[in-house]
A protein has these predicted regions:
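Short, flexible loop/hinge motifs at secondary-structure junctions
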Residues: 1-192, 238, 267
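Catalytic center-proximal scaffold of phosphoryl-transfer enzymes
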Residues: 2-23, 27, 31, 42, ...
């Protein structure tokens, strides 16, 4: 509001205007009106100044609220994205995929097919046939018993086989006679007057390696299976496992030596508790064997304490552990993890470069499998360069799309992903140049699955020697399984002292 006065006059001018022609009272009234107008102008100016200040304050407050609103929107978007994070688009374990209406372990990167559940047409079945059972009987490894139904006659019969297991405790009496010197040559394993045989000990070690039962439950299970005849205790089971671990030292060294000479080995680590603190168990494996180690940390120094890493000169396949880049001569990255991150980026930003790169990596892997089936060891130079150019084009498109990504957190994470894909391009595409390098590190994931199960089911470790014992036992058992060797027979051989199995 602005008040305008066309004429401002002084007292002398007022007198001149009066010129004696106006009454004094009229003049006084006119002066009062002018005074009131002056007062109104001052009051109006003050109100205008106050309103201007108020408007200025409101603008500042509006800007502040706008910033807060933008931050809340960013936080809301980030939290929504976090709710959608699971094992299919991050490195979170499947066991954490708990969402309303859906069970855990129900998420992966596989796409649904139209196939029905169960056996597929053209696949070989695994039904145990009558002919296979008769072959087993002929081998002499099975006790053959005959049971009849109906009256025995010459009219003929049909045969049905029932395969069962009979658990019968055996007490073997060992008689040790004096030698020529009049002494009893008692072997070390028979120092105690009563000992458990290799079969009982092998069963206990095998159950312990599974990691789903505590020692007292293993003892209870074997006691129940023997109808109470064994009378095992928790301490007995621990003693069997400790003895097996001690006897496995030579075999572990052979496994380590074999892995050191391999061109490509896979490794990963998972968290376990040790005396209430966070610790790790790491695997080192190839297609034929695996060795486990306990670690306090995942640092470069902790890795250096494992003799394998300081002597290995091949290619390490891992899940982007930067500390591992200090060891070995070459490195391959797990691309399944990258596929998850690319899926997450597509969901959160809506940008297409990550979807295109994901499709490209899967295409390369499919074509690689076909080439391997045809006996080839690598792509042609022309094909390899084509794939590398397409990879680079996806990253260039990603950089352009990142400029227009709206949400701050998604934009920052996308930029980080693009930087990683560019910096470690050779490591992510090593499987493209060398077919002996796997596309993913799923082998290590499977190797550590038992360790994770043990942590959840039986708990962690109270002492470091307990962790070391478990790692040694698991190394032997999992290697035997991977080589499809008779598990119980070879565990018993180690107990007996003839462990030449590797």
């Amino acid at each position: 509001m602005v008040l305008c006065y066309d004429v401002f006059i002084t007292v002398e001018e007022k007198m001149a205007m009066a010129g004696g022609h106006y009454d004094q009272s009229l003049y006084d009234e006119f002066v009062k009106v002018l005074d009131r107008l002056d007062t109104m102008k001052k009051e109006t100016d003050q109100k205008i100044a106050g309103l201007n200040n108020e408007i200025s304050d409101l603008k500042k407050e509006n800007k502040k609220l706008q910033k807060e609103n933008d931050l809340l929107k960013e936080d809301n978007t980030r939290l929504k994205n976090l709710l959608n994070h699971d094992s299919s688009n991050t490195s979170k374990p499947p066991s954490s995929d708990q969402k309303p209406g859906r069970a855990a372990n129900n998420y992966n990167n596989r796409k649904k097919s139209e196939k029905k559940p169960g056996a597929q047409t053209g696949h070989k079945g695994t039904t145990l046939s009558k002919e296979k059972v008769e072959e087993k009987l002929a081998s002499g490894k099975y006790l053959h018993e005959i049971e009849t139904i109906g009256k025995v006659s010459e009219r003929g019969y049909v045969v049905r086989y029932v395969i069962d297991l009979r658990v019968q405790p055996v007490i073997r009496e060992i008689r040790i006679y004096k030698d020529a010197d009049g002494k009893y040559p008692i072997p070390e394993r028979y120092r105690s007057e009563v000992v458990y045989g290799p079969t009982v000990r092998a069963l206990a070690v095998d159950l312990y390696s599974e990691g789903v039962m505590s020692n007292d439950r293993i003892a209870a299970f074997l006691n129940d299976a023997s109808e109470g005849c064994l009378e095992l205790s928790e301490g007995s089971v621990y003693g069997f496992c400790r003895k097996f671990s001690d006897l496995s030292g030579t075999e572990i060294e052979k496994l380590e030596e074999h892995l050191t000479n391999q061109p490509v080995v896979a490794t990963d680590a998972t968290t376990v508790s040790l005396n209430g603190k966070q610790s790790y168990i790491r695997n080192i494996s190839d297609e034929k064997m695996v060795v486990y180690y306990g670690m306090e940390k995942k640092t470069k120094e902790a890795l250096g304490e494992i003799p394998f890493f300081s002597s290995y000169a091949g290619t390490l396949l891992h899940d982007h552990e930067t500390a591992l880049y200090q060891y070995g001569t070459d490195h391959a990255e797990c691309n399944v993890h990258i596929l998850r991150y690319l899926k997450k980026n597509t969901e959160e930003t809506g940008n297409q470069w990550s979807k295109e790169l994901s499709d490209l990596l899967c295409e390369i892997n499919r074509e690689r499998k076909k080439q391997k089936e045809e006996g080839k060891s690598c792509f042609s130079e022309e094909k390899r360069q084509e794939y590398e150019k397409r990879y680079a084009a996806c990253l260039e498109k990603g950089i352009e799309e990142n400029h227009s990504t709206k949400h701050k957190y998604a934009k920052r994470e996308e930029k980080t992903l693009l930087t990683r894909l560019e910096k470690y391009r050779e490591n992510h595409l090593l499987f493209l140049k060398r077919f002996e390098v796997p596309f993913d590190n799923n082998m290590s994931e499977r190797d550590l699955r038992k360790v994770k199960n043990r942590q959840k089911m039986a708990g962690g470790f109270r002492k470091e020697k307990g962790q070391k014992m478990y790692c040694r036992i698991l190394s032997i058992v999992e290697t035997l399984k991977r080589r499809k060797m008779n598990l119980m027979a070879h565990i018993k051989q180690i107990f007996i002292g003839t462990p030449a199995i590797f």
